[in-house]
Amino acid sequence: RPSWPALDWLQRRFMRWFNQERTKAVLTFPVETMALLSKDGDVLDKEYADFTAQMYAEGHSFFTYMSDNADSLASCCRLRNEIQDNGFSYTLGAGGVSTGSKSVLTVNLNRCVQQATREGRPYTDFLAEIIDLMHKVQLAYNENLKDMLNKGMLPLFDAGYINIKRQYLTIGVNGMVEAAESLGITISDNTEYEQFVGNILGLIEHYNRQYRTKEVMFNCEMIPAENVGVKHARWDREDGYYVPRDCYNSYFYVVEDEQTDIIEKFRLHGRRFIEHLTGGSALHMNLDEHLSAPQYRQLLRVAAKEGCNYFTFNIPNTLCNDCGHIDKHHLRECPHCHSTNLDYLT
């Protein structure tokens, strides 16, 4: 039987130790996730809420996953696995070793919406055809995967590390913000934008349910798009579509818009906007400097109230290129050798 005092000690010890290790070397993995249960607009375990806030204040970098159900696991950028069989699972990076996504096929929403406008058609009709086709392609991919499995070509599946029946076929979305902008919709917490997001994600969810069987599960994920977001923007610009930036957003807000405050960002990644996003999205809250523990604690309450279930805080850490010193704060001069030859990382 698990010992809570021992587990509690180990979790706290590991987080404090790993936070210090990141002052010795640039470490991107493992990705830590603090899983918190919420109730009535706050974290249920107040002691761990305070510990989470303190760790953020001390400069630690980790995700927080918040749920009002104790049946969920999460890790990495966009992953959630719920034990209940309701077709709701974050899939980028596995919450359980055997669960994840076996294929991600991404739709360029900006291009689709603008093409529908060019043709004088409702964007939902145009998208319905594209999304239906995407599901058929995913099913074909799945049949190919099963054929490879039957021929013994997938050793990790055979060894039980990955369960093909628990792997999702994922419909990725990119260009949501840009698609809305092309229609003249203001990107903020407003009814028009909320309805636009709901129309698109609700449509994808409809097809996910339609194509789901006992053997095949689908979900929808707002992909990180570090690579494809740039490609979509470049391809669309070359073909004469409206392209407002060089990399399409992977958030529900415009990243470079300084008028969107912290609270609104939590709302735009809250339950009203992510309701149909069954594959997940992560709010990366970019800040210039670390907040205090009480400030982070208040933001945990905001997240619980707004239903923002997956988030982290990105603050530039200072890396000295001359002496190699790493500091948790956003500095203009190395405190160790006083060099100004610096780089920054989050």
Predicted regions span which residues?
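Conserved catalytic cores of very large enzyme subunits
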Residues: 1-165, 186, 190-343
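Well-ordered alpha-helical scaffold segments within catalytic/enzyme domains
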Residues: 178-186
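Core structural elements
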Residues: 158-179
